[in-house]
């Protein structure tokens, strides 16, 4: 098992070169490619994959008052969860609600494993990342068959187009109107064309952090100076569902490697 504390040592030892040593590229995609190649050359593995390995170990580790692990229900290494992420967010009968990856894991940990005060920390995100990798290579195929799924999708669509805050911005302004154009050091993704939901959770080399889609949503709200929705809240689930549905047909490849 590769320990998470090992990462800062490795990253700091990349030939004395920081993650920003590569000059700002005219093509942001080329910069991502070179950063990726640099890390693979010096470390032999990408940080996101290290976190996913850690997540697998935690997936099989008992925790909480019930003395159960995630694998107690979902099989060793999550063999019964293969392909599950490709259909998320979705409606869950035991919750009588629609849940994204993060919210579903939190619910399982609390209800079935007896874990109290679940936090959206690095350990939690490592588990989420590992679960997502179990759908790698599969097509995103979120459906809207249950009434609550359709309702949540519509809420997500409304949030997507809602102009908010002093900057009067919306998700759509950045990712529809100006999608494909460059802002600062990165290119704004287009939801449908870029199938954005297929590469989250992802490792962000710009801040050396592992992010789930919920973190990405919160980051966007912060950038437009609007108080972000809390983790595990319905706006998070609604926006995640909207993006996942619009990403249908895209091939899942997590953890992503992004700026």
Curated annotation (Swiss-Prot):
SUPFAM superfamilies assigned to the protein according to its UniProt record, in alphabetical order: Cytochrome c
Keyword Iron: yes
Post-translational modification: Cysteine persulfide at Cys-220.
Covalent S-S links between cysteines: none
Catalyzed reactions: L-cysteinyl-[SoxY protein] + thiosulfate + 2 Fe(III)-[cytochrome c] = S-sulfosulfanyl-L-cysteinyl-[SoxY protein] + 2 Fe(II)-[cytochrome c] + 2 H(+); S-sulfanyl-L-cysteinyl-[SoxY protein] + thiosulfate + 2 Fe(III)-[cytochrome c] = S-(2-sulfodisulfanyl)-L-cysteinyl-[SoxY protein] + 2 Fe(II)-[cytochrome c] + 2 H(+)
Residues the record lists as binding heme c 2: 171, 174-175, 220
Gene Ontology MF annotations: electron transfer activity; heme binding; metal ion binding; oxidoreductase activity; oxidoreductase activity, acting on a sulfur group of donors, cytochrome as acceptor; transferase activity
GO cellular component, one term: periplasmic space
Pfam family, one: SoxA-TsdA_cyt-c
Protein name: L-cysteine S-thiosulfotransferase subunit SoxA
Species this protein is from: Hydrogenobacter thermophilus (strain DSM 6534 / IAM 12695 / TK-6)
């Amino acid at each position: 098992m590769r320990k998470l504390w090992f990462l800062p040592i490795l990253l700091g030892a990349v030939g004395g070169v920081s993650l920003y040593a590569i000059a700002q590229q005219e093509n942001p995609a080329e910069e991502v490619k070179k950063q990726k190649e640099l890390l693979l050359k010096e470390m032999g593995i990408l940080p996101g994959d290290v976190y996913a390995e850690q997540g697998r170990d935690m997936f099989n580790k008992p925790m909480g008052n019930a003395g159960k692990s995630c694998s107690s229900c979902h099989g060793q290494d999550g063999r019964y969860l293969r392909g599950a992420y490709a259909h998320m967010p979705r409606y869950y009968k035991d919750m009588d609600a629609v849940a994204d990856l993060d919210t579903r894991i939190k619910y399982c940990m609390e209800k079935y494993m007896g874990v109290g005060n679940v936090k959206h920390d690095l350990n939690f995100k490592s588990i989420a990342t590992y679960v997502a990798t179990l759908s790698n290579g599969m097509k995103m195929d979120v459906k809207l068959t249950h009434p609550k799924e359709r309702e949540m999708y519509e809420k997500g669509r409304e949030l997507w187009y809602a102009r908010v805050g002093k900057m009067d911005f919306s998700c759509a302004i950045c990712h529809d109107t100006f999608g494909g154009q460059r802002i600062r050091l990165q290119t704004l993704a287009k939801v449908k064309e870029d199938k954005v939901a297929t590469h989250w959770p992802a490792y962000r080399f710009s801040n050396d952090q592992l992010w789930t889609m919920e973190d990405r949503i919160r980051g966007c709200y912060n950038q437009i100076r609007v108080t972000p929705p809390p983790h595990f809240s319905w706006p998070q689930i609604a926006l995640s569902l909207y993006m996942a549905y619009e990403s249908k047909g895209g091939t899942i490849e997590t953890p992503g490697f992004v700026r």
